[in-house]
Regions:
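Active-site-proximal helices and loops of the catalytic beta/alpha 8
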Residues: 6-264
Length: 264
């Protein structure tokens, strides 16, 4: 992995030539990521074009969308959470993240995402197609010095991505305070497939979503434990998925639920 800080001060053309040279000399398709700290998607796209997409960039606009959503609460329209982001516009070049060392409280770019909203953010970057997710150390382990707690469900999100977040994706961004999506799994990953429901207000659903006829009669459970009732997929592949108001539910097959092992 090649990485560079403050790439806005280095021409994209230079990185284009440099990365091609390194890959040719090593015979390896080394991935590369740069930090271009700007909330202006146009600037990031221009830079990626200038280096001919030879590198990825941290998705700073997505971080600021997360921050804004965590500050606004139910007034934020979740249907717009991906607007003007690399994850949406250039997913193959997006390194997605929730927070980092610079966005922590007291730092120069302070814009720490509210703790209540971090499950929502990690569900988006870990369980959707598009973008390469980057987990912040302090979110996984906590930071006692800054009195920042660990994101308790982050370990589960990581394992969900590894084992079950595969296959075709379909979005159900149906209301301001309630969105969801499904991943329909694939043949290569046993029990893969999931349904995600995110609420940032009083709306708990349900969302009527199509998992696919191959899941007919399958029983799904909420891995995060926010909903205790199980959901049975209809013979037509459709089902109603809910979540607790203001929280997140990730639904997987009962077999996947029972097999899920989280290493804390």
């Amino acid at each position: 992995m090649c990485s560079s800080d403050l790439v806005k001060h280095i021409s994209g053309e230079l990185f284009n030539d440099l990365l091609k040279y390194i890959r040719k000399q090593t015979g390896m398709e080394l991935p590369a990521v740069g930090e271009y700290w700007s909330n202006d998607l146009g600037r990031l796209l221009y830079y990626l074009d200038s280096c001919e997409n030879e590198m990825s960039l941290f998705d700073v606009p997505l971080h600021y969308n997360f921050f804004s959503a965590s500050q606004a609460g139910g007034a934020y329209d979740l249907r717009t959470i991906l607007d003007n982001t690399l994850m949406k516009e250039r997913p193959q070049n997006a390194v997605t993240f929730v927070d980092n060392h610079d966005t922590q409280r007291g730092q120069s770019l302070q814009s720490a995402v509210g703790d209540w909203f971090k499950d929502h953010c990690y569900a988006i970057i870990m369980l959707r197609q598009g973008g390469l997710p980057c987990v912040f150390y302090s979110d996984y382990h906590g930071n006692p010095v800054r009195e920042t707690p660990a994101v308790l469900n982050l370990g589960k999100m990581i394992m969900l991505r590894h084992f079950y977040a595969y296959g075709e994706q379909e979005d159900y961004f149906e209301s301001q305070n309630l969105i969801g999506w499904v991943r329909r799994g694939d043949e290569e990953h046993s029990n893969s497939g999931l349904a995600a429901v995110l609420s940032n207000g009083d709306n708990s659903g349900p969302l009527h979503m199509f998992m696919g006829e191959k899941f007919a009669d399958a029983v799904f459970s909420d891995v995060l434990g926010n909903c205790t009732e199980k959901v049975t997929i209809g013979k037509d592949g459709w089902a109603d998925f809910s979540c607790v108001p203001g929280r997140v539910s990730i639904w997987v097959t009962q077999e996947a639920f029972e097999n899920l092992i989280v290493y804390e």
